Amino acid sequence: LNAVSPLAGIALCAALALAAQAASPTTATMTEDDPYLWLEDVDSPRALDWARARNAETRDALETRPDYAPAYAQLREIYNARDRIPEVVRRGDAFYDFWQDAAHPRGLVRRTTLQGLRAAEVAWETVIDLDALGAAEHENWAWKGMQCLGPAYRRCLVSLSRGGADATVVREFDVVSKRFVEGGFEVPEAKSSVDWIDADTVYVGTDLGPGSLTDSGYPRTVRRWRRGTPLGTTPIVFEGERKDVAVGVSIDMTPGYERTIFQRSVDFFRSKRFLLEGERLVPLDVPDDASVAFLRDTLLLSLRSPLTVGSETFAAGSLLVADADAWLAGQRKAEPLFVPTATRSLASWSATRDHVLLDVLDQVSSRVEEWKKDGSRFVQREVAAPFPGSIGIRALYDPLVDGVPAEAGRLARAATSDGSLAERYLFSYVDFLQPDSLMLGRTGSDAREPLKARAPLFDAAGMHAEQFFATSKDGTRIPYFVLWPKGLGAASARGDAPTLLYGYGGFEVSLPPFYSGGYGSQWVAKGGVLVVANIRGGGEFGPAWHQAAVGANKQKSYDDFIAVAEDLI
């Protein structure tokens, strides 16, 4: 293959988008001999003018091509397609979605029911129209999400930003009346965090003047704010250090298992956590770089570095479970639900009432496992699912609505619903040639109910995808996917096919198979070859794959990318 030919339709940008995790520039690299050092000041007028000039050159090169206009029109049609799969979130009996299209560029917050979601044409009910709200308030509002108080999920803390900035305004909203609450909770524009405690109390971290923010500009303190009291006079209940990235709080409202955990984020991946016991903050004895969650009487630890528990050491990338009360009492005993291998890593997990569902990447494609607690241990079941491709799992269980079973000496908590969603989950699937689909799954079964599926965005007849492996400079095997156009393949490649090579290699982000109407219609359908390189720095094989190419080792990401290019040739 020869990665040199331009696209016969539209010039698509392709680059190795290596995340900004490289080592700080050394004296050797930052010398006065570098003629481009002035570009380091990214906000300077000179740097911005240079970028504008390069953009203008690119626009001129693209827009003067005779095939630009039809390609542009086709891409607009693809990206504005109304059959996109809604990304719904369950709140009680309602399923909420945030939707943007050509008619609603700022977006709609809308809702339906599960029965409504099953319909071919969903009858959505608009809750907030961002375009209308912005026009009425003369603001350029961008949606930043909302946090609603269960089990009623009527009152929500809505976050809005001006023009998409990091700073937000937080306002209390009633989803039944579809109005902001007069005299309700409201936090002025800042990089804030606000979390419900109960209907009249929240935890808030925000900019309240000198000393309230970290050096990174995020909250340094958490206050307990009671409705009707001035925000500035509320008591500080937790604080971090100025050098921390931020502080925050997570609240588990599961009936009978209520827990509040404060945390100091000391950097991007590490946090120090404290469990609130009465009026006392107790350090949580877990690794700073682990992800921590509680599932009623079970503690789950997702490791980013090795951890020794008793006589056993668990590798980075493992998912451990432990008895929560025993662990908090200092009794260290854990069982692995997942241990990574050279070819398998844990992409994500989600919990129903009685199961933990794992999305496992096996050579960068998804497999699904179910784990169910059986007495004091967990037992596994493999879930039959399409392969190779990308799967997403989102459990629908809500303990505030679906109830809590009796266990660990605690009483059962009755459901306020019929409990029919306690063991259901949303299952999404996509690969290079099959558009997104959304199904409703149930634990203990491989059957799934189709809910939504996108129409194909390009003619995939004759196309096929394959996976290959290159050898990097240090001997590491680097996987990559190739999407072949009709009439081409590894055995029939002529050596002159236009080839687009893409990689990322940062922030532990993985690149499993995906479906792209843009690449498919404007590149592969016109004879181009698409190559996706799973280079180090990403998350394809867990934390170790990421950590192998950060800091002083960032060059390994580039070495991997070069190795794939050479393997193609």
Task: Go through each PLM region and give its residues.
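Bacterial N-terminal signal peptides that target proteins for export
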Residues: 1-10
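Intrinsically disordered, low-complexity segments enriched in Ser/Pro/Gly/Ala and basic residues
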Residues: 4, 23-25, 491
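Beta-propeller folds
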Residues: 13-15, 19-436, 440-445, 459-460, ...
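Serine-hydrolase catalytic core recognition
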Residues: 85-88, 256-257, 353, 385-387, ...
